Amino acid sequence: MPDLKLVYFKMRALAEAPQLMLHYTGTAYSYEMAWDYFGQPWSEVKSSVLYRQLPLLVVDESTKIFQSGAITRFLAGLIELKPDDALLLAEVDALYEASQELFSPLNPTINFAVGEKFLSMRSDLIEQLAPRFEDFERILGSQPMTPFFFGKNPFYCDFGVFHH
């Protein structure tokens, strides 16, 4: 198993699904705050970082994988949380992508809004997300008597939906 280091911030957001996957499989990794990894405040280093955003997965101290979806898919292959069948993989990936689309409305509400602004945003959010949750429920219902979206064992999409 390669040495894995996940670099992000102190918040539940784009690095959460990869962390859940790593914990579920008992895969060793380290978690480093962006300012510690880069040795300076994020605002000072952001423009020099590929895509100007995090998370970042560092593999064996040399290979850097950016973008949360790429990190999740890489880890899913590494720790066997993706199906071998190409058609099932497409379904799993579609569900994962749908779960990631929840991030845009959720993140500002959950991680940054407070007081009256939070209450207002929460009401709008519940109305906006209800149809998405119905979609997830429909997929779960198509696999009766299984604990995960596509059977008895989880795939990376399950962690994406669970987190969001």
Regions found by a protein language model. Give the residues of each.
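GST-like domain detector, emphasizing the conserved glutathione-binding G-site
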Residues: M1-A130
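Hydrophobic alpha-helical bundle segments that form small-molecule/ligand-binding pockets
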Residues: E137-F150
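GST superfamily/GST-like fold recognition
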Residues: V92, F149-H164
